[in-house]
């Protein structure tokens, strides 16, 4: 996936070295955009193997409106464990904001359900938006949303999605985010009777942690393979009815995983 490797190279060669909240230190650029045509293939990195199971289960977890790691752990996914409290709670993070955004009048807004209705009724709307960034609740979240705002666009019977990500850990996090939102776009397109269009990924602070530099250089030495395809069970017409078994990745030829520490 040359588009992603170009990002790695750009940050390594053009980025500014800065301090950060974790104390590790980063090299970063401010403002970067990638575009992936979902008709060409599923944008899952081939220059290192990714754990697709975690990506799919995390997305289904978000769509459930869940904010406790118990369900993830039941399915062998531990990517949120570092931030959970002793009871497994993470506070009002992504799933809560997507499905139960608290309004000032006491209502709870299901942004995802509202989005699905709007795509069908007013596909030309410029308000096909979901936000996870709720300033009133940031302090209650175990980790404020990094991928915080996304918008859909319908044209020529295709559904495209643009994500704004304020904070982008480009070695560990961004490959997951690309695959997750590409898959979400495909799922919403299917249940809306549309084809998947483009996924556009806009990054704010795009950074490499200083203890990921060598891994990034090693990954840049690898040559990408052809993209895989994602087969989604065509019988599913309700977004909230998808199960892990409804997804099948075809022709994924990835090079070995590259280990790197997580900055908490």
Curated annotation (Swiss-Prot):
Lineage: superkingdom: Bacteria
Reaction catalysed by this enzyme: dUMP + (6R)-5,10-methylene-5,6,7,8-tetrahydrofolate = 7,8-dihydrofolate + dTMP
Keyword Transferase: yes
Annotated localization: Cytoplasm
GO MF entries: thymidylate synthase activity
Listed GO CC annotations: cytosol
Keywords: Cytoplasm, Methyltransferase, Nucleotide biosynthesis, Transferase
Binding site for (6R)-5,10-methylene-5,6,7,8-tetrahydrofolate: 51, 169, 263
Pfam families assigned: Thymidylat_synt
Enzyme nomenclature, EC number: 2.1.1.45
Chief localisation class: cytoplasm
UniProt keyword Cell cycle present: no
Swiss-Prot/TrEMBL GO biological process terms: dTMP biosynthetic process; dTTP biosynthetic process; methylation
Enzyme's top EC category: transferase
Active site: 146 (nucleophile)
Entries under SUPFAM superfamilies matching the protein: Thymidylate synthase/dCMP hydroxymethylase
Binding site for dUMP: 21, 126-127, 166-169, 177, 207-209
PROSITE patterns xrefs: THYMIDYLATE_SYNTHASE
InterPro entries: Thymidate_synth/dCMP_Mease, Thymidate_synth/dCMP_Mease_dom, Thymidate_synth/dCMP_Mease_sf, Thymidylate_synthase, Thymidylate_synthase_AS
HAMAP family reported in the protein's UniProt record: Thymidy_synth_bact
Job of this protein: Catalyzes the reductive methylation of 2'-deoxyuridine-5'-monophosphate (dUMP) to 2'-deoxythymidine-5'-monophosphate (dTMP) while utilizing 5,10-methylenetetrahydrofolate (mTHF) as the methyl donor and reductant in the reaction, yielding dihydrofolate (DHF) as a by-product. This enzymatic reaction provides an intracellular de novo source of dTMP, an essential precursor for DNA biosynthesis.
Record note on quaternary structure: Homodimer.
Similarity annotation: Belongs to the thymidylate synthase family. Bacterial-type ThyA subfamily.
Name under which the protein is recorded: Thymidylate synthase
The organism of origin for this protein: Bartonella quintana (strain Toulouse)
Taxonomic classification: Bacteria, Pseudomonadati, Pseudomonadota, Alphaproteobacteria, Hyphomicrobiales
């Amino acid at each position: 996936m040359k588009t992603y490797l170009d990002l790695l190279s750009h940050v390594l060669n053009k980025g500014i070295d800065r301090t950060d909240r974790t104390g590790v230190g980063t090299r970063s650029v401010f403002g970067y955009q990638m575009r992936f045509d979902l008709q060409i293939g599923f944008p899952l990195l081939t220059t290192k193997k990714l754990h697709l199971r975690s990506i799919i289960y995390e997305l289904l977890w978000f769509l459930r409106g869940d904010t406790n790691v118990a369900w993830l752990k039941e399915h062998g996914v531990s990517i949120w464990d570092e931030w959970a409290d002793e009871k497994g709670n993470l506070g009002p993070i992504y799933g809560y904001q997507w499905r139960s955004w608290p309004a000032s009048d006491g209502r709870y807004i299901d942004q995802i359900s509202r989005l699905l209705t709007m795509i069908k009724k007013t596909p030309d709307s410029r308000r096909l938006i979901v936000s996870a960034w709720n300033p009133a609740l940031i302090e209650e979240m175990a980790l404020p949303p990094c991928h915080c705002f996304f918008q859909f666009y319908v044209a020529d019977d295709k559904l495209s999605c643009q994500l704004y990500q304020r904070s982008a850990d480009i070695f560990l996090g961004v490959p997951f985010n690309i695959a997750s939102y590409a898959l979400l776009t495909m799922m919403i397109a299917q249940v809306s009777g549309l084809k998947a269009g483009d996924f556009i990924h806009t990054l704010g602070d795009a950074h490499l942690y200083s203890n990921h530099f060598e891994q990034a250089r090693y990954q840049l030495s690898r040559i990408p393979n052809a993209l895989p395809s994602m087969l989604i069970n065509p019988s599913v017409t309700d977004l909230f009815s998808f199960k892990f078994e409804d997804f099948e990745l075809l022709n994924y030829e990835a090079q070995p995983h590259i280990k790197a520490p997580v900055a908490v």
